[in-house]
Amino acid sequence: RRNPANQLSLPDSMTSAYPNAKPQTQISPRFGLAYQLGDAAVLHFSYGHFFQMPPMYSLFQNHSFLIAPNDYSTVMGNAELKAEKTVTYEIGLWQQLFPGAGLEVSLFYRDIYNLLSTRIISTYNQIEYGLYSNKDYGNARGLEIKFDLATGPISAWLNYTLQYTRGNADNPQQTFSRSGASMDPVNRFIPMSWDQRHTFN
């Protein structure tokens, strides 16, 4: 009972039990629109919400709620984490260059909410530990250019993506680790570890 994350519920029977995680429901609206411009061009727009389940370790790590006697040595899973939510906007234009060949240029922007983070909690005897939570935010924006060619039985395509990805933490334990090293949290957007500026396919 000395661990604030290990609170037992006491129903009328006075039999202690761990509270159950609450079920979560997500609604994912998506919308797409395409408008033909003449005989050789199409303008398109799309909007959508996408969800991704947290990794299993962040839900069930250290499920026995055992805390090491040293500060910043323990990180616990959290069964009530929210799903990572991405809101995507995209607008693009496809243009036929000549019969069988086309060029598409698209701009996109993504807001990424509920990124995994680590909240710092103190036990009653002032031991600091981490609990996974949904505190971080990121976004991605960029440009995609695609050339497609189809002639007879042969088809090919080339794709180039320019992308900038930023967030307020590079990994779920960044703030926790910095606090353990007596460093202040990052107070600005920084490039994410999965930021890939140029991609050719």
What are these regions (language model features)?
Residues 2-7, 52-58, 68, 112-118, ...:
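Outer-membrane beta-barrel proteins
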Residues 6-14, 64-74, 120-129, 175-185:
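Flexible, solvent-exposed coil segments and beta strand-coil junctions
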Residues 25, 35-36, 49, 83, ...:
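Residue-level signature of outer-membrane beta-barrel architecture
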Residues 108-112, 116, 127-201:
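Gram-negative outer-membrane beta-barrel transporters
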Residues 1-38, 64, 71:
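Signature of Gram-negative outer-membrane beta-barrel scaffolds
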Residues 36, 44, 48, 52-54, ...:
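Membrane-embedded beta-barrel scaffold of Gram-negative outer-membrane proteins
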Residues 1, 34, 42-44, 57, ...:
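Residue-level detector of the transmembrane beta-barrel scaffold of outer-membrane proteins
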Residues 24-26, 74, 84-86, 138-140, ...:
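Membrane-spanning beta-strands of outer-membrane beta-barrel proteins
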